[in-house]
Amino acid sequence: MLYSPGPSLPESAESLDGSQEDKPRGSCAEPTFTDTGMVAHINNSRLKAKGVGQHDNAQNFGNQSFEELRAACLRKGELFEDPLFPAEPSSLGFKDLGPNSKNVQNISWQRPKDIINNPLFIMDGISPTDICQGILGDCWLLAAIGSLTTCPKLLYRVVPRGQSFKKNYAGIFHFQIWQFGQWVNVVVDDRLPTKNDKLVFVHSTERSEFWSALLEKAYAKLSGSYEALSGGSTMEGLEDFTGGVAQSFQLQRPPQNLLRLLRKAVERSSLMGCSIEVTSDSELESMTDKMLVRGHAYSVTGLQDVHYRGKMETLIRVRNPWGRIEWNGAWSDSAREWEEVASDIQMQLLHKTEDGEFWMSYQDFLNNFTLLEICNLTPDTLSGDYKSYWHTTFYEGSWRRGSSAGGCRNHPGTFWTNPQFKISLPEGDDPEDDAEGNVVVCTCLVALMQKNWRHARQQGAQLQTIGFVLYAVPKEFQNIQDVHLKKEFFTKYQDHGFSEIFTNSREVSSQLRLPPGEYIIIPSTFEPHRDADFLLRVFTEKHSESWELDEVNYAEQLQEEKVSEDDMDQDFLHLFKIVAGEGKEIGVYELQRLLNRMAIKFKSFKTKGFGLDACRCMINLMDKDGSGKLGLLEFKILWKKLKKWMDIFRECDQDHSGTLNSYEMRLVIEKAGIKLNNKVMQVLVARYADDDLIIDFDSFISCFLRLKTMFTFFLTMDPKNTGHICLSLEQWLQMTMWG
């Protein structure tokens, strides 16, 4: 993976998420509430179910609608000022570009009309040589933009047409960027960081052109700040501009069919980048004797065969996003090789300008660069003019400490708790694409991406080390769906494939060639107990089916136990009557006293006694007449249930500690007749486990009682088992506050 700090500062230089759709946010709009946490997650899921997030129906980032905000500004005669990404030091960065850094001294925010007369959004079209890097270390982003400019139809999906500094100008622009499985529409104001009336970051070779600077600002807004863009991989930018999936190739050990893969990539309109990897910071941006920059992101912009000395020579066109410093070896702008090529080919290919773009032979490319990255485009990205051979599916998921962050196979006790996904590959590839002759194989590209790390860098977040393992499904487990496989499966069966390495990069991917059949993919962090969100994408050359292996939320509906006073021993009756008094019923406080007196003899549990919340849940569960109290028979039934749950707890407490490990919670709840999917389990562990991922007996009982009560409420109101109920606000408040 490539990380580069970008061009050094000159010695004289001193400077340097989606929710509801109702109203726009910004200086020209009314303020609205924003969703956070679980509410935001549920709302986003609902929006995606309605098709929001597709490119033709992009989700408005931060609930900001470009059309509504621009219309409001035009109506009021104001220029847009973005409250979500203000023209303030906080938008520049947090450390090297932080408010107290000398790198940001004398930076001012200016609109293009304050910098130059008659600014243009786009001037005479767009080409890879239009853009130059500023002082920010985001050469990877510029290399991606440079590659994007070679495919205008893709570029104008990211940079919507019809934007200018003249017609309907209101100081607001917008861009569409792919983020972790969905397209988002990002608006920005046109206040840009400058010094001495010159742009500090990305800028065009033409001083009056501003589309690239505004696109960089939109990407910085998504990432939280400009500094968050420092360091990265060209493929990250290409994926976010196309929604495609990346593959990496080490050129010291290139696959035998690499040239064929390159030709296919060009045919499929794939976008490409390359670099010379470094092993230490001292090598960053040092030059080779052929004027190539180490640790720097280049874009690959073309492939051409030419007649040279009686044979065909394959040339590759490469671009340095700095817009200068070019390869000076064979086939460079002034190389003698061009003199032996037909003049019409020279005119077509050769442009002797210092624009950062150059040609080199395929062999020199292999000898000088160490990493090639190819971004394969997905069918929804491409129009009819382009070809794509991929069928795609994707899933979003989370690793959560204590419930679904099981770590890699080195941790068999928790590995099985990771999210699980199943894929069916019924059909082999076409014979002409199968280099293995008569062996039927299915090409499958699996890509695992962790989400939102750039935005969290300001809080010190680091990329997790991630990877995945793939298992072939044995016959006895085929066609199953609503089940989360347990530890025994993974200790019995061997894996069938895996990501090449576990690595702390945004994405890991592997292209696998598998026999037709069913497979299970387990994505994980390397170490357990690491929180992260992820996107898993599966690309196949033929039709495939896939789904998440997870439990369906379910509770056994057991017959209510019946008891009579004849079943009760005299000590039990005597104790109840003492606590209940003359009323013969007990409320929440009496229930708490009674249970805690009866539980004294249970020495095998670590307990501080039953809390009031747990006792309220018990009354909610057992109270049939709505009185808020329990009679003798109701209490006896409750006590029998509690004893049963105690037995289950004791059975699962294998180390006899009187507590449970949070990863065992799923097994305990299943033994008690309830099955929960990953999303619900994550909530339970977050609520009931302590910092050491331990659940004591009190928390277990409180959790289980709440589950039983909520299932009972829901199923009572859903007699036809539709899986949905409808509540008014009043009913919702009544049930949640009481339950």
UniProtKB/Swiss-Prot annotation:
Domain EF-hand: 610-636, 640-675
Intracellular or extracellular location(s): Cytoplasmic vesicle, Secretory vesicle, Acrosome
InterPro entries cross-referenced by the UniProt entry: C2_III, Calpain_cysteine_protease, Calpain_domain_III, Calpain_III, Calpain_III_sf, EF-hand-dom_pair, EF_Hand_1_Ca_BS, EF_hand_dom
Region called Disordered, residue ranges: 1-34
Pfam (any one): EF-hand_8
Main location: cytoplasm
GO BP annotation list: proteolysis
GO molecular function, one term: peptidase activity
Keyword RNA-binding recorded: no
Binding annotation for Ca(2+) 1: 623, 625, 627, 629, 634
Subunit structure: Heterodimer of a large (catalytic) and a small (regulatory) subunit.
Annotated protein name in UniProt: Calpain-11
Provenance organism: Homo sapiens (Human)
Gene responsible for this protein: CAPN11
